[in-house]
Structure formats: structure tokens, C-alpha cells
């Protein structure tokens, strides 16, 4: 079974209640129910956190086939001192748009990640680095058109390391991201 992981960042737990003039009245639960109904043969996993480190951990967990959690330690087949930076560079060089099977024994093929990093879009170099290491496509989603928002929101640190970006289509952007991943 194909799996798509949707990761939302800070304040998106308040979707449907927060700044409804910008973000709309649909909750993320409603969005997920609609998406699951549209694509019953796909397993969706939804994660949300207001904490930057959680988003980084999840992108690494889902997006990097062999994980980078132990990359700071030398491991077999790697030279002494081979660390996270080397592993990340290797992952970036070997980056592929093909689905990755999780080594954990999970039978689901990860097709990609849909990422709405919220405010971390504009500030998190660490999240950008995690996305750059992803071996599955990451689609950046923004409910509003950040290019038409306040000056500080117009810069995305993620766009150039994501496979695709969708912005300004409301919560339909999540469905569009799923469709983009399915089309491959």
C-alpha cells in the first residue's frame, strides 16, 4: 500500500478557528477526511507539531531511508569521522524522486511528504537541511499565497529544496499536493 505523510507545523492545529479570513473555516480533520475519501487506496499519516525539532525528526524519519539518527557516529563502511554532514551530502547527491521503502519492515511504500511548515517556512534553516536530505519528494503547501502576505512571510527557505510548491489554494492545496505526488 502506498503511504503519503502530511506534516503540519505551528498553529495549524488551530486551522478552522484561527484567522478564518486567511485560512478558512475547515479544520485539518475535515481536510483529512475529504482526502482519505478521495484516495481510499492510499494510507495517509497526519502529523502536526508546534515544535521545530519534531518536524525535523519526522522529515528525517519518513524521508531518509536509512535514517540519520546515528549519523554522528562512525558506522560500518564509512571512514572514521564520517558524520551527519557527510551523510546529508550523500543523501542530497543520491536524492531520488522514486518512492522509498522503509527499512523498518513496514509494508507501505512512502510516496512522499506533504509539508506545511507554517512559520518555520521563513525561519528554519535546520528544517530546510532536513528536507534537502529527504529521499522522497517533499511538496511544500501554504494555504495562503505567502508571496502576497507581509514582507517577512514572502521568503521561503524551503521552496528550492522541495520537489514542488503549492500556495494560495486554501486547504485544496493539500489535495493538489497529494495529486502531484500520485502523478509522480
Enumerate the predicted regions with their spans.
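Extreme N-terminal starter segment of soluble prokaryotic enzymes
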Residues: 1-4
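Short beta->alpha junction loops
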Residues: 42-53
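Short acidic/histidine-rich motifs immediately flanking catalytic phosphotransfer sites
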Residues: 62-67, 107-113
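Glycine- and acidic-residue-enriched helix-capping/strand-helix junction motifs
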Residues: 14-29
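Mid-chain, well-packed structural core segment of small domains
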Residues: 108-147
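A charged, well-structured terminal subsegment
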Residues: 167-184
Amino acid at each position: 500500500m502506498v503511504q503519503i505523510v502530511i506534516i503540519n507545523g505551528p498553529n495549524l492545529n488551530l486551522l478552522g478557528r484561527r484567522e478564518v479570513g486567511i485560512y478558512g473555516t475547515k479544520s485539518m480533520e475535515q481536510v483529512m477526511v475529504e482526502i482519505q475519501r478521495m484516495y481510499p487506496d492510499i494510507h495517509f499519516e497526519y502529523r502536526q507539531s508546534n515544535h521545530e525539532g519534531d518536524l525535523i525528526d519526522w522529515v528525517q524519519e519518513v524521508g531518509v531511508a536509512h535514517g540519520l539518527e546515528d549519523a554522528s557516529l562512525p558506522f560500518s563502511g564509512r571512514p572514521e569521522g564520517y558524520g551527519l554532514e557527510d551523510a546529508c551530502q550523500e543523501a542530497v547527491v543520491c536524492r531520488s524522486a522514486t518512492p522509498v521503502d522503509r527499512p523498518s519492515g513496514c509494508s507501505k511504500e512512502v510516496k512522499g511528504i506533504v509539508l506545511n511548515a507554517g512559520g518555520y517556512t521563513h525561519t528554519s534553516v535546520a528544517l530546510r537541511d532536513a528536507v534537502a536530505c529527504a529521499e522522497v519528494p517533499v511538496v511544500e503547501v501554504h494555504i495562503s499565497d505567502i508571496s502576497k502576505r507581509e514582507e517577512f512571510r514572502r521568503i521561503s527557505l524551503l521552496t528550492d529544496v522541495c520537489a514542488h510548491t503549492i500556495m494560495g489554494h486554501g486547504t485544496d492545496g493539500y489535495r493538489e499536493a497529494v495529486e502531484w505526488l500520485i502523478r509522480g
